[in-house]
């Protein structure tokens, strides 16, 4: 008669797949993945609520906000130009140490 894997010479020679009950961390991994999913779900729900709130604005309110946003973007562009100019002046002054 053939012996099972565990009975041969007192040592297991063939590898049996471990069950989830034997992995103490398996349950933790499942909970962690579920927690991540739950966090992502809650975050997407909050973002959706914010999007819905913005859709209810009147056209006049959105126009005012668009103008303010455009003004802020223009200010950012001008500041970037200034920083580039300052940076290029600084690098040019390093090149010529007169």
Curated annotation (Swiss-Prot):
Pfam families: BEX (PF04538). It comes from the Eukaryota. Keywords: Coiled coil, Nucleus, Repressor, Transcription, Transcription regulation. Signal peptide: none annotated. It is found in: Nucleus. Residues 59-89 form a coiled coil. The keyword Nucleus applies. Residues 1-24 have a biased composition (Basic and acidic residues). Residues 1-31 are annotated as: Disordered. GO terms for cellular component: nucleus. GO terms for biological process: negative regulation of DNA-templated transcription; negative regulation of NF-kappaB transcription factor activity. Belongs to the TFS-II family. TFA subfamily. Plays a role in the negative regulation of NF-kappa-B signaling at the basal level by modulating transcriptional activity of NF-kappa-B on its target gene promoters. Associates with cyclin D1 promoter containing Myc E-box sequence and transcriptionally represses cyclin D1 expression. Regulates telomerase reverse transcriptase expression and telomerase activity in both ALT (alternative lengthening of telomeres)and telomerase-positive cell lines. This is Transcription elongation factor A protein-like 7. It comes from Rattus norvegicus.
């Amino acid at each position: 008669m053939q012996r099972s894997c565990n009975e041969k010479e007192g040592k297991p020679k063939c590898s049996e797949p471990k069950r989830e009950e034997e992995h103490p961390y398996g349950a933790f991994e499942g909970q962690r993945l579920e927690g991540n999913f739950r966090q992502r779900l809650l975050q997407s729900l909050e973002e959706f609520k914010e999007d819905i709130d913005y859709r209810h604005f009147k056209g006049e309110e959105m126009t005012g906000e668009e103008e303010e946003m455009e003004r802020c973007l223009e200010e950012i562009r001008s500041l970037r130009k200034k920083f580039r100019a300052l940076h290029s002046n600084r690098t040019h002054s390093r090149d010529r140490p007169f």
